[in-house]
Regions:
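Long, acidic (Asp/Glu-rich), low-complexity accessory segments flanking structured domains
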Residues: 1-55, 62-241
């Protein structure tokens, strides 16, 4: 009986695909807020893109010339990094074209406007044609096909990057939560209510722990998951499917 329960749960979560003999209708008509998506951070970017991840988070720092660089490890040592421009080129080459949107989360670990302006410059000279403006939460997954959705925080304000950002976790429509906050919220009902209409992104803690999925990161409706959970797989899954 227990194996059947496990299989049923995995199928409901979208982790088991029907056999080739069945015709599966993928509902792409619902708003973005109604889809779960697994993401990747601090993983080799090209590897993550080749796996098909449509949510990538990059941690951006300033180098000695105030150019934007992306940390390759959680506890950045000022050594292991790559240029932000090279990341943009890889995203351009590997993430598009696609039937799915691509969500790029940028965490700026600098208050230097020059660096943020250079981030905007590299985005504009690589993936600009895939970017969009305006609200995205209520748009259907299908209408966002092949688009780049940019999310970031307060550090983008007052820079050339700000008008490129679709969602900020410092505004009321997006929340940035740690794994602990998402799975053990202080106000569970309030979080469930929030995620019915808005988006929550779940990120690893500072120790970048490896999770065994003992707790359901999606339990209170949090849609975007950057925690390296074993059951995580690329793509968008309708949360009521």
């Amino acid at each position: 009986m227990e194996p059947l329960i496990v299989v049923g749960a995995l199928a409901a979560a979208g982790y088991i695909v029907a056999s080739s003999e069945e015709t599966v209708h993928e509902d792409r008509s619902q708003p973005l807020v109604d889809y779960y998506v697994q993401g990747s951070t601090f993983e080799d970017l090209e590897t993550a893109l080749d796996k098909g991840f449509r949510l990538i988070e990059l941690h951006v720092y300033s180098d000695a010339q105030d150019e934007p660089v992306v940390a390759l490890v959680p506890n950045y040592d000022q050594v292991r990094h790559r240029s932000f421009n090279s990341c943009c080129v890889s995203i351009l080459q590997k993430a598009f074209p696609s039937k799915d949107p691509f969500i790029l989360s940028l965490v700026l670990h600098t208050d230097k406007s020059f660096t943020a302006n250079r981030v905007a410059h590299y985005l504009n000279t690589t993936v600009r044609k895939y970017m969009m403006s305006g609200p995205i939460e209520d748009q259907s997954l299908d209408s966002l096909a092949g688009k780049l959705i940019l999310v970031s925080g307060n550090e983008a304000r007052g820079t050339n990057l700000e008008p490129l950002v679709n969602l900020s976790w410092n505004d009321s429509h997006l929340r940035r939560l740690t794994y602990q906050q998402a799975t053990y919220p202080r106000e569970a009902e309030e979080l469930s209510s929030f995620t019915r209409e808005h988006i929550a992104i779940v990120v690893p803690d500072q120790a970048f722990s490896k999770f065994k999925m003992l707790d359901d990161v999606y339990g209170y409706g949090c849609q975007w998951n950057l925690c390296p959970t074993p059951l995580g797989r690329p793509g968008f899954v309708l949360r009521d499917s």
